[in-house]
Structures are given as structure tokens and as C-alpha cells.
């Protein structure tokens, strides 16, 4: 069956970016039921929405990575998430050594635990906090920022950068001609990149002459002939990828996990009483609200039929992993957070040879941060006077999380 035989999909013409940013689940629930692979006009792209189709496309030899148009406009080339072949192999060999489990285990506790404790000390005696801004995001960005070598950049600036890059990357709407519907929406991403370069260029100058153990210093030198370094223009797109995706994912993942646990008070109590359950709570939080919801894509390298749809060579497909993780064909009552759900694999970190390189690091940042939070404030409660609003289609998480506790 081809898309021309699906007149019932005319409703997709009315879907807007605002609708997807506010709540993509309604649209994607219908897509999963009616057309697991469908062309969505506002995105100018085919979209995969079920677990089966997302995994099939992500792992198929008939597809390779491609960056979305808005992502390419934001990051430039060669960004690690959108390249293939020798360039992808080189970039993965550049970033992966510092993220190997044996390497992460060597320093993760000493890196993250003092950061988490430092932020907790600022509010643990107040009896109230907004955890996204005061804890989850700062711990996430500070942990990665220090790993990269950006100790001189304060956490609020790192949060500002990833927010601006996020809005630029997800400025995905196109008009009937396939042109960006809101080209001015890339301006703040350009501003963030200019600020990033103003800070990082002098550091790169220093690291070229005086290498240290920071990640970006290793990116410059590792695997290169003596006396040579990778060109900064070659690594900047991947720096931007890290400053967006890798900066926000642990923060939004732990915030979503907390919101999920607050929806099941008895499960929150279990996790507080038994911290060994924290990794399981995080895995369910990532499935329940995937931080990287629909930000990656593939492109067909030959004519192929997927989910009954004939795709010519050169057809991009967006992979909506957040939708795949709500697939009723795989998960029972997927819109409900459930710590005791059978531990099935999820797609929050992607699949195939472009799966997230930082899975182990991100999981341990979240684990340590929640361990410290529950140890310091075991009687944490959501402040029900304040609502919880989730936002985002490419990247998704709670915009705020107000909590209270007795001091």
C-alpha cells in the first residue's frame, strides 16, 4: 500500500508545531494506530511512530543517518548524529573512549556527587524548591560541562545555551514549498553558538599547545599523528550536539522520573527506602517521557518498503522514539508511570550504530543525583498548588517541578 491510497490521513494537514510541542501524544497515538510510517506536512518528512518501525529503520542497512533540516541549520556539518562512514567512525572514536563503562566508573562518583551535594546545600533547609531549575538541570549541565573542560562557564549559562540550541534545533516547521516557516527562529541558536565559540576558541588554543584530561582536549588529540590535532571546525558541530542533547537529557530524564514517581506515591516511597531501585525508576522515567523525543532521523539509501509504504531512495524518516516508547503493542498502559513494569528494552537512547554514545554516563549522572536528593530530603512531596507542564517535541521534559518538605 502506498501513501496515495491513504486519504484518511488528510487530518495530518492540520497538525501544527505548537500542537506537537505542547502534547505530541495525541497525534502520535493516532499515527501508531492508522499509519506507523506517515508523511507529516508540517515537518516536511516521513515520521516513524511505533517501536517496530523505529527500530526497523534505525537498524536497517537500507538507511543511514541524516540530520533533520533544522538540526543541520543549527549544528552545521559534520555533526556526529548526522554523518556516516569514515567520518562517523572517526567522530565516534573521538567521543567514545571517555564514555566507556570502565572509564566512567573510574571518575563518575567523584565528578557528580560533589556537584549534587553542592546544589542540594543551597535549598535543602528551605522546605521548598523548583527542582528543574535548582537541581536537575544544574547537576546535569555541570557534570557534563566539567567533563568537557568548561569549568569556567557557569551552570546558568550552560542551561541558557542548551535552551537556545533546543529552540533552534526544533524550529522544524516548513511551508508548502518545503522552506522553513520561521527562519528567524534560528537567530537565538546562532547567538548561542557565537557565545560558545567566544568561550571555547581560547580553550582550544590552550589545549592544542597544552593537552589535559578534559574531553574536548582528547577530541583534539586522540588518534591523530604526533604534532597534529583535529581541526576545530570539524569538532564544533559535535560540541554543539553535546551542549544540547547531552546537556539536557540527564536533567530532563531525572525530572520526568520524579514526576512519574510523584504520580505513584507508594512507588516513590519504595525507591526512597531502597535506593537500589533508582536505576529501574530512571529506566521507566525515560520510557514514560523520553528526553530526546523526536530529534533523530535516517534517510533511505535505496528504494524500500517500510510498514507498507514505498519509499524512494533519498527519503528522510524522523524517528519518534518518545512515541515508540508509548506503543501499546509493546507496553501495557504506556501512558502510566509504573516502577514495576516488566523491564522491557526502551528506545530513549535510540538504536543501531547511531545509538547514544553516552548511555552509561547519563544513567549514572541521574542515578547519583537522585541518590543524593532522596538521602538529603527523603520526605519530598510535589507541591500540588503548582501544576506540572511538559513541553517539547524534539526534546521533551517538565518545564518546572515544585516540591515541598518538612524541615
From Swiss-Prot:
EC number: 1.14.14.-
Keyword Metal-binding tagged: yes
Swiss-Prot/TrEMBL keywords: Aromatic hydrocarbons catabolism, Heme, Iron, Metal-binding, Monooxygenase, Oxidoreductase
Required cofactor(s): heme b
Gene3D superfamilies attached to this UniProt entry: Cytochrome P450
Pfam families to which the protein is assigned, alphabetical: p450 (PF00067)
InterPro entries linked to this entry: Cyt_P450 (IPR001128), Cyt_P450_B (IPR002397), Cyt_P450_CS (IPR017972), Cyt_P450_sf (IPR036396)
Domain of life where this protein originates: Bacteria
Chain positions recorded as substrate binding sites: 241, 245
Gene Ontology terms for molecular function: heme binding; iron ion binding; monooxygenase activity; oxidoreductase activity, acting on paired donors, with incorporation or reduction of molecular oxygen
Catalytic activity: guaiacol + reduced [NADH--hemoprotein reductase] + O2 = oxidized [NADH--hemoprotein reductase] + catechol + formaldehyde + H2O + H(+); 3-methoxycatechol + reduced [NADH--hemoprotein reductase] + O2 = 1,2,3-trihydroxybenzene + oxidized [NADH--hemoprotein reductase] + formaldehyde + H2O + H(+); anisole + reduced [NADH--hemoprotein reductase] + O2 = oxidized [NADH--hemoprotein reductase] + phenol + formaldehyde + H2O + H(+); guaethol + reduced [NADH--hemoprotein reductase] + O2 = oxidized [NADH--hemoprotein reductase] + catechol + acetaldehyde + H2O + H(+)
Xref: SUPFAM superfamilies: Cytochrome P450
GO biological process: catabolic process
Pathway info: Aromatic compound metabolism
Positions bound to heme: 88, 92, 298, 321, 351, 354, 356
Assembly description: Monomer. Forms a heterodimer with GcoB.
Family that this chain belongs to: Belongs to the cytochrome P450 family.
Biological role stated in the UniProt entry: Part of a two-component P450 system that efficiently O-demethylates diverse aromatic substrates such as guaiacol and a wide variety of lignin-derived monomers. Is likely involved in lignin degradation, allowing Amycolatopsis sp. ATCC 39116 to catabolize plant biomass. GcoA binds and processes the substrate with electrons supplied by the GcoB subunit.
Name this protein carries in UniProt: Aromatic O-demethylase, cytochrome P450 subunit
Provenance organism: Amycolatopsis sp. (strain ATCC 39116 / 75iv2)
Gene: gcoA
Amino acid at each position: 500500500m502506498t501513501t496515495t491510497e491513504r486519504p484518511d490521513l488528510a487530518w495530518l494537514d492540520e497538525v501544527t508545531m505548537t500542537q506537537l510541542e505542547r502534547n505530541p501524544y495525541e497525534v502520535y497515538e493516532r499515527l501508531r494506530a492508522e499509519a506507523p510510517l506517515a508523511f507529516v506536512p508540517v515537518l516536511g518528512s516521513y515520521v516513524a511512530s511505533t517501536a517496530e518501525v523505529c527500530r526497523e529503520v534505525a537498524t536497517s542497512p537500507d538507511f543511514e543517518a541524516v540530520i533533520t533540516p533544522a538540526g543541520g541549520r543549527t549544528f552545521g556539518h559534520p555533526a556526529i548524529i548526522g554523518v556516516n562512514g569514515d567520518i562517523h567512525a572517526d567522530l565516534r572514536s573521538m567521543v567514545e573512549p571517555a564514555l566507556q563503562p570502565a572509564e566512567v566508573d573510574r571518575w563518575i562518583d567523584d565528578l557528580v556527587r560533589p556537584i549534587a551535594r553542592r546544589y542540594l546545600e543551597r535549598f535543602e533547609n528551605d522546605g521548598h524548591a523548583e527542582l528543574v531549575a535548582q537541581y536537575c538541570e544544574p547537576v546535569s549541565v555541570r557534570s557534563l560541562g566539567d567533563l568537557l573542560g568548561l569549568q569556567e562557564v557557569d551552570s546558568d549559562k550552560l542551561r541558557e545555551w542548551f535552551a537556545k540550541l533546543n529552540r533552534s534545533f526544533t524550529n522544524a516547521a516548513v511551508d508548502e514549498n518545503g522552506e522553513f516557516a520561521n527562519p528567524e527562529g534560528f537567530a537565538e541558536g546562532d547567538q548561542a553558538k557565537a557565545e560558545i565559540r567566544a568561550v571555547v576558541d581560547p580553550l582550544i588554543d590552550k589545549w592544542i599547545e597544552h593537552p589535559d584530561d578534559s574531553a574536548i582536549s582528547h577530541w583534539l588529540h586522540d588518534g591523530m599523528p604526533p604534532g597534529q590535532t583535529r581541526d576545530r571546525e570539524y569538532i564544533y558541530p559535535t560540541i554543539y550536539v553535546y551542549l544540547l542533547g547531552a546537556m539536557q537529557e540527564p536533567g530532563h530524564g531525572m525530572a520526568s522520573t520524579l514526576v512519574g514517581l510523584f504520580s505513584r506515591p507508594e512507588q516513590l516511597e519504595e525507591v526512597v527506602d531502597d535506593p537500589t531501585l533508582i536505576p529501574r525508576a530512571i529506566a521507566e522515567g525515560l520510557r514514560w517521557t523520553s528526553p530526546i523525543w523526536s530529534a533523530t532521523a535516517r534517510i533511505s539509501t535505496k528504494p524500500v518498503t517500510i510498514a507498507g509504504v514505498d519509499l524512494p531512495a533519498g527519503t528522510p524518516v524522523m524517528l519518534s522514539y518518545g512515541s515508540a516508547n508509548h506503543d501499546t503493542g509493546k507496553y501495557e498502559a504506556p501512558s502510566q508511570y509504573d516502577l514495576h513494569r516488566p523491564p522491557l528494552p526502551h528506545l530513549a537512547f535510540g538504536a543501531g550504530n547511531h545509538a547514544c554514545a553516552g548511555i552509561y554516563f547519563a544513567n549514572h549522572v541521574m542515578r547519583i543525583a537522585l541518590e543524593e536528593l532522596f538521602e538529603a530530603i527523603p520526605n519530598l512531596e510535589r507541591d500540588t498548588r503548582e501544576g506540572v507542564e511538559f513541553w517539547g517535541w524534539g526534546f521533551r521534559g517538565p518545564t518546572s517541578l515544585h516540591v515541598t518538605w518538612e524541615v
